[in-house]
């Protein structure tokens, strides 16, 4: 078995990644598959934190464009991330992975409050920590929450699981001439408007030199491959 390249990482998943082929909600088979891959990572001694989006349940930005108050819509989106976080906790604990959910919004009956030192202690004890409710503030995406939490826990990289095997010059589903970019500088992502993470999240990573690795989550075994240093996606880092 390969020696892990990283000892502490943050895995960022979109809400849609939990929906599977149904496109909405949470697909039990899909979430179980992801949980098994996470278990394999933990068994290698890697400390892993998670941030999950909420787009499979509710999108605050989309709702605000339809006339809903943006702050209220974003609050609903944060609650959607908590639903996904609790679902992932259940999937992980059913296969024997100790997990803690920490929420940026106080909801003490279902999750711990976000406390940085406590989160780090959980990681040191081999528990998976799931950060829910984004940053706890409207107008900030879960990508930004992932960047913030990754820096707070001193993660060595953000692993962003997507539906494509990296970053392309254009949408490969719409443009047959699109080519994959195996390596990118943060500034190029910002200048070219590439769909890696939103500008705020990318800028945070750039300012703190935190690598972002974009990879295909839909192919089984890819999480462990990235952890072990296989270059299967796109790595975004300093020039």
Swiss-Prot record:
Record carries keyword Nucleotide-binding: yes
Subcellular location: Cytoplasm
One protein family per Pfam: AA_kinase
Top-rank lineage group of the source organism: Bacteria
Record's GO cellular component terms: cytosol
Enzyme class: transferase
Pathways per UniProt: Pyrimidine metabolism; CTP biosynthesis via de novo pathway; UDP from UMP (UMPK route): step 1/1
Function statement: Catalyzes the reversible phosphorylation of UMP to UDP.
HAMAP family: PyrH_B (MF_01220_B)
Family stated for the protein in its record: Belongs to the UMP kinase family.
Name assigned to this protein: Uridylate kinase
Annotated source species: Pelobacter propionicus (strain DSM 2379 / NBRC 103807 / OttBd1)
């Amino acid at each position: 078995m390969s020696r892990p390249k990283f000892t502490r990482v943050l895995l960022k998943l979109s809400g849609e990644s939990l929906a599977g082929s149904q496109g909405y909600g949470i697909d039990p088979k899909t979430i179980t598959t992801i949980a098994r891959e996470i278990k394999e990572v933990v068994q290698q001694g890697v400390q892993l934190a998670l941030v999950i989006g909420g787009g499979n349940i509710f999108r605050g930005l989309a709702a605000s464009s339809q006339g809903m108050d943006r702050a209220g819509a974003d609050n609903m989106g944060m609650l959607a991330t908590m639903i996904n976080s609790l679902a992932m906790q259940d999937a992980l604990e059913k296969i024997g992975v100790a997990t803690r959910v920490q929420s940026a919004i106080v909801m003490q009956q279902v999750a711990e409050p976000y406390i940085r030192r406590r989160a780090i202690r959980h990681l040191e004890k081999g528990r998976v920590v799931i950060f829910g409710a984004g940053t706890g503030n409207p107008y900030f995406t879960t990508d930004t929450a992932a960047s913030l939490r990754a820096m707070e826990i001193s993660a060595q990289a953000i692993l962003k699981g997507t539906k494509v095997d990296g970053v392309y010059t254009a949408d490969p589903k719409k443009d047959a001439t699109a080519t994959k970019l195996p390596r990118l500088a943060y500034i190029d992502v910002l200048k070219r408007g590439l769909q890696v993470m939103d500008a705020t999240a990318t800028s945070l990573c750039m300012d703190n030199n935190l690598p972002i690795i974009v990879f295909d989550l839909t192919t089984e075994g890819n999480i462990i491959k990235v952890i072990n240093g296989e270059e299967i996606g796109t790595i975004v880092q300093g020039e």
